[in-house]
Amino acid sequence: MNPFSSGTRLRDMIRAIRACKTAAEERAVVRKECADIRALINEDDPHDRHRNLAKLMFIHMLGYPTHFGQMECLKLIASPGFPEKRIGYLGLMLLLDERQEVLMLVTNSLKQDLNHSNQYVVGLALCALGNICSAEMARDLAPEVERLIQFRDPNIRKKAALCSTRIIRKVPDLAENFVNAAASLLKEKHHGVLITGVQLCYELCTINDEALEYFRTKCTEGLIKTLRDITNSAYQPEYDVAGITDPFLHIRLLRLLRVLGQGDADASDLMTDILAQVATKTESNKNAGNAVLYECVETIMAIEDTNSLRVLAINILGRFLSNRDNNIRYVALNMLMKAITFDDQAVQRHRVTILECVKDPDASIRKRALELVTLLVNENNVTQLTKELIDYLEISDEDFKEDLSAKICFIVEKFSPEKLWYIDQMLKVLCEAGKFVKDDVWHALIVVISNASELHGYTVRALYKSVLTYSEQETLVRVAVWCIGEYGDLLVNNVGMLGIEDPITVTESDAVDVIEDAITRHNSDSTTKAMALVALLKLSSRFPSISERIKDIIVKQKGSLLLEMQQRAIEYNSIVDRHKNIRSSLVDRMPVLDEATFNVRRAGSFPASVSTMAKPSVSLQNGVEKLPVAPLVDLLDLDSDDIMAAPSPSGTDFLQDLLGVDLGSSSAQYGATQAPKAGTDLLLDILSIGTPSPAQNSTSSIGLLSIADVNNNPSIALDTLSSPAPPHVATTSSTGMFDLLDGLSPSPSKEATNGPAYAPIVAYESSSLKIEFTFSKTPGNLQTTNVQATFTNLSPNTFTDFIFQAAVPKFLQLHLDPASSNTLLASGSGAITQNLRVTNSQQGKKSLVMRMRIGYKLNGKDVLEEGQVSNFPRGL
């Protein structure tokens, strides 16, 4: 007999496929068999239909397409015999899913079989419906399934309950139809029916709030009694698993009680005793007992429970941490991370065990335990926990050092009791895992060092000793090079010795040796080499006796393949050779970097509630990155070419703070084209924003000069961010310089502002702030409107760092004068005024419209309010 003939049995086809040695042979066998099956389908021979479908199911499991046999499933389902129906329903569940249109044709057959007199046929239909039920089928067949929940046979009731779960997931609107039927299943004695009934109730509670309240009031006590009976029941062989009576039912009941007790104190009180009983009586030496205990802990943590029961639950998790099974330890760590929000002290008792998990060979457990330890750290235990983590950092795997060092740095920055301790711990991390430390961490360390003037000598000596031993740690070398460049004289002269230090002797040549090694080492990157060059330039002034050696090291870098290094070497050599008279002032110590300002810039320029556009940072010469600033255009949802204006709250660049423009490129580009004219406002001229006043022209020229300082010296940028801007004094003199700017005219004086009158408006009002606009026109210039904004504080708290920003469409031009103050007193006891000038290029055709943003600090927290003004008077 040919093994591939139409009469091949399923067993023979499987044997032939398994005998194939290559995938090509297998495809040939399957292709031949599928062709024979298609031929038989076309002949519509009912004799071999069940055999063909069985073959198709096997072929489908191998991954080959079998869509041509879907109609055969429907034909077998419609046949009267039970064997044919069984194969047909099996094929239906395997070859089809709920997205197939063919399912529309099987709904009628399912309805007939659900009403069949043979309970086994009913069971087949329920199984199929529970597996592939679609929303349309659920609506059509829900009444039959609801009726079958009350069927006399427990197997049918069990399958009907599972099928009901599928139906309410697909069509939540049908949930209320199954509430009473589901409640009746909770009284069943048959464990199979009971567990499906509990699952159905659980689904109903998560989908329908009314069902949740119904089960909470009507069924909570019954569920508690059922759980108590199962917990206290005698040995039952048919349900016993490792000494636990039906752990699956235990778990389902606990999950349902968790939903019922969550957010309801009365229901939680009812289940307190049984949860304590389950937690204390369940054995934890087998996996089944651990599963029940875990669900019990989950329930205790979720309900409105007392602290005593939560302490019991946390102690159970502590025992889990000592288990040899990695899965149990992992879930215990996960649960403890949730439990720490409820009872920190109870979790702290297991701190030693959790620390041991950080050293676990399993990577997942190590990472989760490290996250938990980070949550456990506070001001009282930071010293002990940090010591433990740093000790482990020395022997940890390379793969784990990055995560571990990042967490240690986070802990040290957040909880350090003093700067000396902070510096010591950071140096230990840099020594052990310096190459894994991120840039912002060592930047922050430098900021802290610069602020700790009494520790400059101690720090530079500690770094010098560390870099001699751990020269392969790139980040450590960078910090050491920076500190030696800044405080090399303190290193050589042993200035600022602390009692905990041992005296060391370091010569000027020794200090330069460290810098030379950093710049000549083959694996040093460009950042380290650039920082080393800067340090050499600074040491040439601090160590005049070896300035020639320093000069020789700098000259060697003229031949560097890196353009940046070449340029620096040439410029620094010129400074050492030709500009000795200004060298000492050029290489003076950097001004103290403001920690608060640095932290703000590190976290972002705007509050977290304001979305900022991703933008590359601006690299500054000392390696510190300037964070990008979100453009006001994006914040106010206007077109990118709309014109915007706002007064700068500090001495920083107008463009950088408001528009997010690269201040280095803009200033350099302008300087390359022409020299700035004295007394002209270059920024406003470039942007064509409006007509500046002479006083503002002079300050803008100063602002342009400060741009170069910001680029060359980040510390100036940090300082200017926190310094208030000087108020501008309007004057009417020096009008001749405006003739150079294509007919721009000086700002109108108050005496000349007496155009037509317009009614004032309330531009913006919230529960805490009110903004009023008053308007006036300049005679002979109807396109320009003078607006005076008055800001009133309606809240009982004073606003500080107040700033008003605005943006207008591109047919408008906007100019803002400085505000009268940056502090807005509480309860309307004082007001801030600010003058705006709006030029409407389409005056008479389009009305004024403005988007505005108001920022201020309330009790030290940044607050941001936004609004749109569209109720300007007509004619503006």
From Swiss-Prot:
Xref: PROSITE patterns: GAE
InterPro entries linked to this entry: Adaptor_Complx_Large_Subunit, AP1_complex_gsu, ARM-like, ARM-type_fold, Clathrin/coatomer_adapt-like_N, Clathrin_a/b/g-adaptin_app_Ig, Clathrin_app_Ig-like_sf, GAE_dom
Coiled coil location: none
Cellular component GO terms held in the UniProt record: AP-1 adaptor complex; nucleus
Membrane-related topology note: Peripheral membrane protein
Cross-referenced PANTHER family: ADAPTIN, ALPHA/GAMMA/EPSILON (PTHR22780)
Function according to Swiss-Prot or TrEMBL: Subunit of clathrin-associated adaptor protein complex 1 that plays a role in protein sorting at the trans-Golgi network and early endosomes (TGN/EE). The AP complexes mediate both the recruitment of clathrin to membranes and the recognition of sorting signals within the cytosolic tails of transmembrane cargo molecules.
Localization of this protein: Golgi apparatus; Cytoplasmic vesicle, Clathrin-coated vesicle membrane
Family indicated by similarity: Belongs to the adaptor complexes large subunit family.
Alphabetical list of SUPFAM superfamilies matching this protein: ARM repeat (SSF48371), Clathrin adaptor appendage domain (SSF49348)
Disulphide-bonded residues: none
Record keywords, A-Z: Cytoplasmic vesicle, Golgi apparatus, Membrane, Protein transport, Repeat, Transport
Subunit text: Adaptor protein complex 1 (AP-1) is a heterotetramer composed of two large adaptins (gamma-type subunit and beta-type subunit), a medium adaptin (mu-type subunit) and a small adaptin (sigma-type subunit). Binds to EPSIN1. Interacts with DRP2A/ADL6 (via C-terminus).
Ranges of residues in domain GAE: 756-873
Gene Ontology terms describing biological process: intracellular protein transport; vesicle-mediated transport
HEAT repeat residues: 97-135, 136-173, 248-284, 308-345, 346-382, 384-417, 418-454, 506-545, 560-599
Domain of life from the UniProt record: Eukaryota
Descriptive protein name: AP-1 complex subunit gamma-1
